[in-house]
Amino acid sequence: MKVYHSSDTAQVGTGLINDYKKNIELVRPFVIALKQNKECFFNLCLSGQYIRAVLGKFNMKNMDTYFVKWASEGIFEYVRQNEFPEFPNRIESNYFFDSIESSKRLFEEDWGEADQEERDKIRLFEVELRDDHPAFFDMNWFDEAFEVIYELESLDQIDTAIEYARNYFGGKQSENYRFEIVSNKEAVIV
């Protein structure tokens, strides 16, 4: 299956490595917290909010939303493990798009405000995905969950983010859906 992938490290002729940065270690504490209870997850997020405030105060750019990303991924992994185990783990997978246009649109959304030096590091690749049944998900649900966790002030918001994860894995389409292809199978850059 021909798909498209953006990367700052990939090279033509090589295979993509699932979770090459080993980010699952950043997600695991949030999954463990949710397995305990929502209060534990909430407290872990509060710690992240404190770290975000400290990083912001000392102008450590590009770090202030990392905990939100990993907390959101933790919610999605918790829901996947408990309700949708047939799907691949998001963190230990690669992400693709079925068209160049979709990949370029995501690049503009994610990197549109970055300085030119950062933008120049990201390249678009055509990839041969060797997966007979890749998963297609509406990435808007992840973005919505991210926003909820970014603004987290109550336990009810955790339930909202969990519902967004269910929508994502359940195949529900949002109003302006944007599909991403998620696979942990072999993928070679051509």
Report the location of each language-model feature.
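An acidic/histidine-cluster motif and surrounding catalytic segment
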Residues: 59-86, 90-91
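Conserved NAD+-utilizing ADP-ribose enzyme module
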Residues: 2, 8-62, 66, 90-92, ...
